[in-house]
Amino acid sequence: MSEHPLQVFRFCPKCGSQDFEIHNALSRHCAQCGFTFYQNPRASTAAFILNTKGELLVATRGKEPEKGTLDLPGGFVDNEETAEEGMVREIKEETGLVIDPEKIEYQFSIPNVYRYSGMDIHTLDLFFVCHVDEDAKVTAADDAANLQWIPLNEVYVERFGLRSIRQAVHRFLAQNC
């Protein structure tokens, strides 16, 4: 069973007081020092990488959650990164592909809850599309256990493990097939 981080955090991160009460659904407030902690969603990215043969690059998840299911290359945006920079970094980390940030196109976003270390991490998943040559060399690394190119008409939504990825793949296929 997972919990929202605001249910787990019991002490003020500024002064250490136990007088750290729920302020509203998104925050806790410390009665001792006046600090208010807001739990905002984390930015996350995922890529629809298409080659010139019209195939989608799909990863097999190498780690929990949903280890062994299909996924899109992507991950969390780091501090001080733009969404595009985070997307380019994640693509390189998981596939070895080097993509020009100017060549990725934003598609849409989906709010999500990502369960990790027993907590519900609220995310805003940003989806991008980019195109590569059909002979682009890919190597599975980081969170990706395996990579495969799949023709769009052979992509099955139910094989993707994460809810927001399934929703995004369904939406992308509806717009592009």
Q: Where do the protein language model's features map onto the residues?
A:
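Short functional micro-motifs and their immediate structural scaffolds
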Residues: F20-E21, Y38
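Active-site-adjacent beta-strand/loop module that shapes the phosphate/pyrophosphate-binding cleft
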Residues: F108-K137
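Conserved Nudix-box catalytic region and its N-terminal flanking loop in Nudix hydrolases
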Residues: S2, N51-E93
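Short linker/helix segments within small regulatory modules
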Residues: E21-S27
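Short metal-coordination and nucleic-acid-contact micro-motifs, chiefly zinc-binding Cys/His arrays
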Residues: P5-F11, L26, A43
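Short cysteine-rich clusters marking metal-coordination/redox-active sites
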Residues: C12-C15, C30-C33
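Conserved N-terminal beta-strand and adjoining loop/helix that marks the start
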Residues: Q32-L56, F76
